[in-house]
Amino acid sequence: DTFDIPADLIPRQFQQVIRHCLEKNPQKRYQTAHDLALALKAIERGQWQVSSGTRKLWPSIAVLPFIDMSPEKDLEYFCDGIAEELIHALSRLRGLYVTSRTSAFQFKQKALDVRLIGQQLNAATILEGSVRKSGTRLRITAELINTSDGYQIWSERYDREIQDIFLVQENIAGAIVENLKIKLAAGFDQPLVKRYTEDLEAYHLYLKGRYFWAKRYEAGLSKAMDFYLQAIERDPEYAPAYAGIADCYTILGSYGFLHTKTAFDKARAAAEKALELDETLPEAHVAAALISFWYDWNWELAEQSFQHALQLNPNDSPAHIWYATFLSMMGRFPEVEVEIRSAQKLDPLSPLVNSLAGCALYMARAYDEALLEFQKALDVDTDFLVALSFIGSVYIEKSMFNEARAAAERAVKLSSRSSFSLASYGSILAVLGHTEEAQSVIAELQNRSKEQYVPAFCFAMIHIGMKDYDRAFAFLEESLQDRNIQICFLKESPGLDSLRSDPRFRALLHRVPFP
């Protein structure tokens, strides 16, 4: 049987999804079942507004990755770079709320209705565009769309030589300011798109570095660093490239891929050089903050650097979420909530932002809320390693032991058995009473340590789970000597609660200058 349902009884948002499924042009339909599921989830979560009233989101914008229309399809890094440069430029405007890169780029190569994208990103307008290259000529199109009704506000086509890319970006940013009626601050007389180099090849190398840095895995970081170094060879005064190198080394050091001292000494040199060249570069201040936080244990300077970065760019979601992480380590949990919400407003679909929010809430012992944040991250990316690596600790606190083991096993597999994922897995096995399996993980890490760096904290985690506290304290002592970043967790981490009554733990705490 069939039923005729009056159109006015079908929610407007669901009608839009159906129309999208029935588009005559296949390219305009949902390209995968996952894309359709995203649309339906948005309705389920109430992210579509049922009322017909206009949302008060103005002025706000999400810049989507530009589409590579070149026959060779070899400009993905360049298309991403244009969008990212525009995000950076627009983020400097005080009167405009700008969705961060990670969330905007979740819609890369997805044929979704801009109204749905606007709802998911909480953005009143969308900027999208395309790039076609022929020889030394570029054709760049850009279109600004109102997400409440899908209508075009502005569009333009630029046919230029490739060396004019900075001028094109400036023109696009200026058109957005004009069309969204953004009032520039008094005395704001500088270009919206800051030009850090006149060397076009250095600029391309930097964009390639950003492309690989965004992947955030060890091989990608190595490639990113190589491109940044090549950019610096061409232009030794290219400040963002130095900031990029600092970012890479802080990640490599924090993930345990490099010895802490090696990583943070190199990160410090790069961050200081970036700030020497341009003290207004927000990402360089964030890198400096992380070095002061994770390695120097200079909490006052770390906080000053975080706050300076946010003064320079209030739309910097990584700065907000790393500042939240810092505040959680300091036990300042009411302030943590403010920074988490600021980061999530700017970057609602970022798996990293939501995972770090989960970590901060775990430190606050808000386990139900932490679990929700990790699950939000995994809803977007089911294989997101940071979420999988930490959600197990929350499951343990909630006595969800099967889930804890399953998450840890996935993290080990997806990370190609990285040291930290193995340590987390080993500690969970130990807590579950699987001592023999936990011992085999220790043996694997010991064999690895003969050829490459394995942070001492990895061994400490497993011995804590086994209640072998003498060995755990020996490895914690080594971790303190090496300044493993996990030492910053000593004061607040629930995973260390079993040690807190031990005089050795209190003595260890006194050697770290916690406030």
Pin down the residues of each PLM region:
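K/E-rich alpha-helical interaction surfaces of small helical-bundle regulatory domains
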Residues: I153, Y211, G495-P515
